[in-house]
Each structure stands twice: as C-alpha cells, then as structure tokens.
C-alpha cells in the first residue's frame, strides 16, 4: 500500500520570514489572520529587522474609511525619506522630511480630496547639518521650524512669512508639544531645571507656566510626551534603571488654571512610576483614551 505524502509540508521559519518580509505591510493584517504562527511573525521585531536588511522598508500612507471600517493604501510619496514629520491643515497632509541621500530635505502635500501628492517649495535651503525639520500647526497656519527661524505658511495665499527670527524661536525646537484648551504648551529641559511654557497667541510670545511646584527634574536624555487629559496636562517621560537595561515610564498629571489674560498656572496633582519597559522601546505617541 502506497504511503500518503503530506500535501502541505511545513516550510523553514527562516524561509517564511524572508518571504513575508518582501510583502507590503498593507497585507499584514490579512496575513495575521492565517494562523497563530503568522500572527506572531507579523508582531515580531525580527520581521522588521529582516525588512531593513533586505531594504524593503516602506514609507506608506494608509487611509481608514470609517464608513466601511477598512484600510486602504494611499498613493506613495514621490521620494524616499529617511525620516519625516507631518501635520494636517485644511484637509491636506503636509509632510516634511530628509531625503534618502541625506543631504537635502523635501516638502510634500497630500490632498485628501484628489488623493494626490504635490511638492511645496520651502523658504529655506538648509542641509542635514543645519536644518531642524519640524512642522507644527497652530494659529490656523502651518509653521516650519529651522535653525534660522520659524516660517508660517498661509495656505489660502500660498505664501511663507517669517514669524520668529532664530534668536527668539528656541521654544519651537523642542519635541514635546500639545494643544490643551486651545493653548499650545511645550516643555523645555535644562541642566538645572525643567520649565513649561505656553504660547500667547494674541501677544505672539511664549510665557512661563507659573506654579508647577513639585514637578520633578527630567533627565536630560529623557523622551517627553504630553497629552490633553480631560482639560488637564498629562506628561510622560522615561528614565533608565541602574545598568541601563530597562527604562521606567513616569507620568505626571497637572491641573491648569488661567488667571487673567496674561497668566496660566499649573498645579502638579500627582506623579508616579507607572510602567517598566526594555531599553529598546521608543516613545511614538501618547493618546488619552476614554473607556
């Protein structure tokens, strides 16, 4: 009697990993439904390390249609970017980033109505050595930050205007920003102390957030993130444990009170260590969720 052969012999894990790494990330949600092993593979860091080694990294735009609750891949950027920053203004997505050659930057605009990308000229020509590519949206305009100053983009007139010269714009260069109650806040780390600032839109200047008694000094290399927590300010930051093999995530909750038109006070209600993670983790974004 002839023995029956297995019609679906298993493939080596390394071969499966190599094959999946060559597939667009758009199809990963579907692949994760195939089996538990595929689901584990899609979630594994080894997959993304392999994609990087094979030069299969992607700069993709995924669009969620809320009516059908489905994801679709949008048109790709016309240039490959090493890193980027983005924001939304007037139903358009503005993306600024460093090109893959590492020596130039680009500005691209995605029109959500026409589903197309278009280049946008920038008011500076800095290279990777002196350009801090950050875009921030407030006062109804797009603000482009460079070491030479801050330029605001008027989308209706298609014009850039210098709003802050380089000597006055240091508050824009920090990564921790959040709009809380229609007011922009940022945190400035220093060797001696940490300060929180808010932007007075009418006076067009940054002002010190008063109070803040009990706010701990953040490590100079800490990654900071801020979020609107029901009208209060929640600040999260990290700090290494001894040995630097793990990090502690800390959180502080700060109540905000406006006193007149020129002062805002902050009261630190509590802060505590809330989580321990491996040192390899990175803060990406902080969201306040209501369950």
Curated annotation (Swiss-Prot):
CDD domains the record matches: F-box_AtAFR-like
Name of this chain's protein: F-box/kelch-repeat protein At5g38670
Kelch repeats: 46-91, 92-140, 142-187, 189-232
Alphabetical list of Pfam families matching this protein: F-box, Kelch_FKB95
Domain F-box, first and last residues per copy: 5-51
Keyword Transit peptide: no
Source organism, top-level taxon: Eukaryota
Keyword list, A-Z: Kelch repeat, Repeat
